[in-house]
Curated annotation (Swiss-Prot):
NCBIfam families, per the entry: PRK02935.1
Entry membrane topology: Multi-pass membrane protein
Family under the similarity heading: Belongs to the UPF0295 family.
Pfam family, one: DUF2614
Keywords, alphabetical: Cell membrane, Membrane, Transmembrane, Transmembrane helix
GO annotations of cellular component type: plasma membrane
Transmembrane segment boundaries: 18-38, 41-61
Name this protein carries in UniProt: UPF0295 protein BLi00901/BL05075
Record's subcellular location: Cell membrane
Organism expressing this protein natively: Bacillus licheniformis (strain ATCC 14580 / DSM 13 / JCM 2505 / CCUG 7422 / NBRC 12200 / NCIMB 9375 / NCTC 10341 / NRRL NRS-1264 / Gibson 46)
Top-level taxon: Bacteria
Length: 115
């Protein structure tokens, strides 16, 4: 079985990576101190990456408030479900609210509308 994680955690990880990518881009800009224009371009791109991560964090925060909160039957901790199937944030137990999918092997394609 492939390694899955909850959708909320995936999006949060993406936003965190944008922050670090922004810092790395700005750090690369420091090496071009002799060219003010080139250094400024790298600094602006880095700040834009950090601002984009802020927007992603805000979006996932708003999405998280609308997610269905359930108690995982495996670890008995509260977790949130986005879509028809998702994973527990704590123990990676496959979770679903759809009675038709109970007992089936976990597959993220169940969340696509073409199904």
């Amino acid at each position: 079985m492939a390694k899955y994680s909850s959708k909320i955690n995936k999006i949060r990880t993406f936003a965190l990576s944008l922050v670090f990518i922004g810092f790395i881009i700005m750090y690369v800009g420091v090496f071009f101190r002799s060219s003010v224009l080139l250094m400024s371009v790298f600094m602006i791109l880095g700040v834009l990456s950090i601002l984009l991560s802020t927007a992603v964090y805000f979006w996932i925060g708003m999405l998280s408030t609308k997610a269905v909160q359930v108690v995982c039957p495996n670890c008995e901790k509260p977790t949130k479900i986005l879509g028809r199937v998702d994973m527990c944030m704590h123990c990676r137990e496959p979770l679903t609210l759809d009675k038709n999918l109970e007992g089936k092997e976990f597959n993220e394609s169940y969340n696509r509308k073409s199904q």
